[in-house]
Regions:
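Subset of outer-membrane beta-barrel
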Residues: 1-308
Length: 308
């Protein structure tokens, strides 16, 4: 079997500024920080099921990542003609291939229940980058920037080293009744490097734990008994450590699969509440609430009926 797709990996879009009171000599001034861009990937997946061992499936994903991102830091003197404003700009372009492997084993029992065990592994990835660095000064003329001088310009090559990761999981299902699942993941972010620099005091290995369950009271009963009720919990130690404090995350979710047709079409609704970070050591904790809606169709499209 074969499958493909195009998905975003990351998106950067921010602007932040810090203004200072007006000074009698230099006037007002402020620092401005900005960034934009993103990385996308094209995926091609292949799966194979050996004829001599049909309970096992093997998969390979080949991914091509590409994109660019830009960030800048500006010191601005908008009210003074005697002081030059300055800006530092960084432009990065990336292009690289990445591969990951997966296996799945499924055992069906005589009563119709099924046990599924899966594992995946993402290889470490070397990403070459094209880097542009520019530092220049400018002044304002009626709020229009006029470039005065290029202080420094560099065009170099570098690299990003993405770490290996793997995950394992299992699920047990009783068809049209219930399903429970557990999975564990690990990513070696302590080995991440950007332009040859590692960040051992900030980045650490990340462990994730997830558990979930789905229950259908009676698919032949009334409407509320046909609803799929879902519950899940997730926890990750986090890849960041700030001020010697781990930035972990925990969340719980509740969902419903609402049937709207006999063929199996559903409207899926979920609600997730979680916490990320901590208030210890003068840090910030984020409490978030997510709501999602999706639609799954299992109707027979493009089916030509014999009788109208």
């Amino acid at each position: 079997k074969m499958a493909g797709g195009l998905v975003p990996v990351s998106v950067i879009d921010y602007t932040a500024s810090e203004s200072f009171p007006t000074d009698s000599i230099i006037g007002s001034h402020k620092f401005i920080y900005g960034g934009e861009g993103g990385i996308n990937k094209v995926m091609l997946g292949l799966s194979y099921q050996p004829s001599f061992f049909e309970k096992l499936s093997i998969g390979l994903n080949a991914e091509y990542m590409f994109g660019n991102y830009y960030r800048s830091s500006t010191l601005s003197f908008p009210d003074s003609a005697n002081f030059l404003s300055s800006r530092v700009e960084y432009n990065y372009s990336i292009s690289a291939f990445n591969f990951n492997l997966a296996m799945q084993y499924s055992q069906k029992f005589t009563n119709g229940d099924a046990l599924t065990i899966g594992a995946n592994y993402v290889l470490p990835t070397h990403i070459p980058t094209q880097n542009q660095y520019r530092h220049y000064t400018f002044t304002y003329n009626a709020a229009v920037e006029i470039v005065r001088d290029s202080v420094q310009y560099e065009n170099t090559e570098g690299s990003i080293e993405l770490p290996q990761s793997f995950g394992v999981g299992l699920s047990y299902e009783r068809k049209n009744k219930f399903l429970v699942g557990l999975d564990f993941g690990y990513a070696q972010w302590s080995e991440f490097s950007l332009q040859g620099i590692r960040y051992p005091k900030i980045l650490k290995d990340n462990y994730t734990f997830n558990a979930g369950a789905e229950y259908k009271p009676d698919i032949y009963g009334n409407y509320f008994e046909k609803i799929a009720y879902r519950f899940g919990v997730n926890y990750q130690t986090g890849m960041l450590s700030l001020r010697n404090t781990d930035i972990s995350q925990i969340g719980v979710s509740l969902g419903f699969g609402l049937p709207i047709k006999k063929q199996g079409t559903q409207v899926n609704i979920y609600l997730e509440y979680g916490k990320q970070g901590t208030k210890a050591n003068n840090l910030i904790r984020e409490d978030y609430l997510r709501v999602g809606v999706s639609f799954s169709a299992k109707d027979r499209w493009f089916f030509k009926r014999k009788y109208q």
